[in-house]
Every structure is written in C-alpha cells, then in structure tokens.
Amino acid sequence: EKVSKYYSACLFEHALHLPLCTDAKIAEQFSLHLAEEIDGVVMPTIVYGYKSKPLSGGGPLFPGTIDLNGNTLIYLVHDILMELIRDGFTKIFIMNAHFENEAFVVEAMDLVNRETNGAATIVESNWWDPMPEDVIDLIFDKVPFPGWALEHAAVTETSLMLYFAPELCKMDRTVDVVSTNALPYFRYPLKKDDVPESGALASCAYSSAEKGKVIVDKVLPELVNICKKEFNL
C-alpha cells in the first residue's frame, strides 16, 4: 500500500536572487526524494499559501506574492485530503515548506480526521523540523544562525535551491544584509519599510550547493524514519 505524498508551499518573494516558487520547489524536491525511499506517490503541489508575515516571510508587500485567506487554505487542504481518502489512500504525508501554512494545514487534518473517523493516518512536517541539531553548526560555519523566522531567502533556502534547481538561482543579484530585528508584536496596516527593499531578512552569504546537499542528506533519513514509524512501513 503506497503512501500518498503532497506538499504545501506558496508563491512568495524570496529576495532578488531566488524565484517566487522557492518554497514549492523545495517541498517538491524533498517529496520526490522521500517518495523514492518509501515507494510513495507524489501528488501535485499546492503552490499558494497563507499570508506571509513581514518578519518571517517578507510579508505581502512585494509584487508576485500571492496570498490565500486562512479559511481558503483550510478547505483546499481539507478537500484534497478527502478526495485522497475516497480514492483509497490511508497513509498520507504532507510536506510543508511555508511556515505560516502549518496551523491551517493541521486544522484541515483535524477536520478530516473527525469526518472520516480516522480512516487515514495523516502526517505533516516542515522540512526543517526533523533537522539534526548538528546540521546548524555545519551550515552556519561562517555566519551566525538568525533563527528560522528570519532564515528567509538566506543560507538554508539558497543552498537548497542551488542544490535542487541551480538554473533558477541568480546569485549575481544577491544582496548582503544585516539580519533584521524581529519585533515582539504585529501591526496593521503594514508599512513599506517593515522589511528591507530586497525582501531578504538575513544574509545568504556562504550559501552553496554543497551545503544544500548536506541538509538533504541529513534531513531525508529523518523523514524516512517518521514515515516508517507512523505508517508501519
């Protein structure tokens, strides 16, 4: 019995050097790699996601950033899960690559679980959640780790994109920035100077395809272990 895998991401600015589809591409590639390891079936991506917060994903201030409302994302994920279960899938793994999606994805999982009386085991993970702690030291050997909220279009995402899809990276357009200071509150309306003009929240200096490979090589076995445990593979 195969595991159905699909991934939620978004179309959001990722500074000047990475494409709008960065989150979708990273989630897709992790899903494809994982599917090879567990003989899974990979569904098409959900390319639109919930609103990005200014100091974790750059916010909605940039052209090309396409946002969904929370209810829209909940019922989009809900309906896809219901269709997969109707088609006979009982083991479903959701690979998330956009932090702000998670609460709404989990809400959809909860609704589906109630409506189907637990007919399927549904697992969700952000690609960075199972990352072993020692990987941070390996990746951030020359610059400090700014925290996951500010690691937007910075070292990890840039390194993963250089590994997964170097043809989509424009490294001549990188802008070295000092890590943005996270605010302890949110405010509406948003202001143009809430985030740097480049959209980057931390430096991507010293990113490389080699570091991207290190991340994949360390995270992929952890994802496999999650699937083996939860799906009894």
State each model region's role:
Residues 1-92, 97-233:
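Extended, histidine- and acidic-residue-enriched regions that form the cofactor-binding/catalytic faces
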